[in-house]
Design a protein with these regions (language model features):
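Conserved non-transmembrane functional hotspots
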Residues: 31-190
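Membrane-embedded hydrophobic alpha-helical segments
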Residues: 1-48
Length: 190
């Protein structure tokens, strides 16, 4: 083999190696660009999912959990005063009747209205929905009794006891959703 043939063979060999490296680099670059594009899309989808989750939690908290929780908490603060309806002291009895009429019943009605309007936000928790419906039923019976003019009979007297599990269930759900909301906000802001 002559020098010229060896030189031509070396040039062709180097050109083929260069071409092979260029083709490999081209495909590697395309793969990396596609990978970056997929990663970017996945990150964007995660941001959108997180944002939607934040919006849903915010709606649940602001339209259902916190308002119902606060109405129930207000009931907890004053309900014992209505037990004085049967007091021998006329001032205490009148005060209890007025608290029941002007505060407890409207407060119950407001809580029921919130529940009725926003039950769909109750996170499809069948146990919580059942407890909330017991509360709504209790309030309906309570209102019906008072609408008849009867101020002596309580819902318990007609087989409709107060659902003692309503406040703990709402409190637990509210605090759980609030914690989840704050965690998502913190993660989303980073």
């Amino acid at each position: 083999m002559t020098f010229r043939q060896q030189l031509l063979l070396t040039i062709i060999d180097k050109a083929l190696i260069g071409l092979l490296i260029a083709v490999a680099g081209f495909w590697l670059n395309r793969y990396l660009e596609a990978f970056k594009s997929r990663q970017s899309l996945q990150n964007e989808l995660k941001k959108v999912r997180d944002q939607k989750q934040i919006e849903l939690l915010e709606a649940r908290l602001s339209h259902l959990y916190w308002p119902v929780y606060l109405h129930l908490q207000m009931d907890n603060v004053v309900w014992e005063r209505i037990l004085e309806r049967k007091s021998q002291n006329p001032i205490k009895a009148a005060l209890a009747a007025q608290i029941e009429k002007d505060f407890i019943l409207p407060n119950h009605e407001a809580a029921c209205q919130i529940i009725k309007s926003n039950i769909h936000l109750a996170d499809l928790d069948p146990q919580l929905i059942e407890i909330l419906l017991k509360y709504v039923r209790h309030v309906a019976v309570y209102r019906a009794i008072r609408a008849t003019g009867n101020t002596e009979t309580d819902p318990l007297d007609v087989g409709e006891p107060w659902p003692y599990d309503v406040f703990p269930a709402i409190e637990k759900a509210t605090l759980l959703h609030q914690k989840e909301f704050q965690t998502l906000l913190k993660q989303h802001s980073q």
